């Protein structure tokens, strides 16, 4: 269990994070007696699932010195298994025995450790496979071979550099995911470079979630292209963009930097056509395949000489 964040709330009677945690805890409770339940020690909601978890408990944590703090310390004292990020390595503990599995910098999907969410994924994957007896050399080789490329993981941190522009395609469709992506963007952006973002969220999320996406986007991007999916999931056309724009503008972001477009193709093209060397474009697609093809066409053609940004009256 990686974490519990505020997504899908307001759907099917799940109104709070505590409600969602109770639903997710069914997975932990259903683990067979001889199985292993892998939990994130850094997330309070996930940590609380340990009380009712089935099978043998396995912890993972990205905190420094996690092996010497609770709940991992007492777990290891009783001979348990834990995987932690320690001294730049993925470290596996079995009781007091420590094994360095792989350097985090050697895991391509973490981008040298900059993509902290993929560090968490690597820790969780190591915990799960090590608990099942997979040799650490095999785990290290697998983590070293798996990338965040479109071929390995479509729509999950796919990166392409073209014409001096870095393009990132990632399905960050909720506030927690956008927050994590924003941390990475802050680390990768070049001095003096702009960051363009194509941003959206499914229409069946709460109004407050849509507004929060706009607030978060304003703190990450210099130019925002809000767009809507073909299926509004019960919302009228334009209403999703309106709420996200409301959030962005509430932060004091200039209205000239907030754009509302009808679809993701137009939003993608607007970002790519106006980016210049040193800029970054972050695309959050619904049609992952179609948008990736569009990005590749951008890479294969000469950059357009466009000076103005699109008008706001797109939808």
Question: What residue ranges belong to the model's regions?
Answer:
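ATP-dependent carboxylate-amine ligase
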Residues: 13, 112-115, 127-137, 141-315
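Beta-strand->loop->alpha-helix junctions that form or flank phosphate-binding loops
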Residues: 55-86, 142-145, 158, 259-262
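Acidic-glycine-rich active-site phosphate/pyrophosphate-binding loop
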Residues: 80-107, 156
């Amino acid at each position: 269990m990686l974490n519990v964040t505020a997504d899908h709330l307001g759907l099917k009677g799940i109104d709070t994070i505590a409600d969602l945690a109770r639903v997710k805890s069914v997975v932990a409770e259903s683990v067979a007696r001889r199985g292993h339940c892998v939990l994130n020690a850094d997330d309070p909601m996930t940590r609380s699932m340990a009380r009712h978890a089935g099978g043998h408990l396995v912890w993972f944590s990205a905190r420094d010195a996690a092996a010497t703090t609770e709940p991992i310390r007492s777990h290891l004292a009783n001979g348990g298994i834990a995987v932690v990020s320690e001294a730049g390595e993925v470290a596996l503990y079995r009781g007091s025995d420590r094994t360095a599995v792989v350097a985090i910098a050697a895991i391509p999907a973490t981008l040298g450790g900059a993509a902290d969410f993929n560090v968490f994924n690597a820790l969780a994957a190591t915990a799960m496979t090590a608990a099942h007896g997979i040799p650490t050399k095999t785990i290290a080789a697998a983590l070293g071979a798996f990338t965040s490329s479109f071929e390995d993981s479509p729509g999950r941190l796919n990166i392409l550099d073209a014409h001096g522009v870095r393009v990132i395609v990632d399905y960050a469709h909720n506030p927690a995911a956008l927050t994590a992506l924003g941390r990475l963007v802050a680390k990768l952006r070049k001095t003096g470079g702009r960051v363009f973002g194509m941003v959206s969220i499914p229409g069946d999320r709460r109004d407050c979630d849509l507004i929060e996406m706009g607030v978060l986007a304003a703190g990450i991007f210099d130019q925002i292209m809000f767009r809507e999916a073909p299926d509004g999931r019960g919302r009228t056309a334009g209403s999703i963009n309106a709420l996200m724009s409301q959030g962005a503008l509430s932060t004091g972001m200039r209205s000239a930097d907030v754009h509302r477009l009808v679809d993701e193709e137009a939003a993608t093209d607007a970002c790519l056509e106006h980016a210049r060397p040193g800029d970054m474009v972050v695309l959050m697609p619904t049609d992952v395949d179609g948008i990736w093809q569009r990005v590749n066409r951008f890479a294969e053609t000469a950059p357009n000489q466009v000076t103005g940004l699109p008008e706001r009256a797109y939808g």
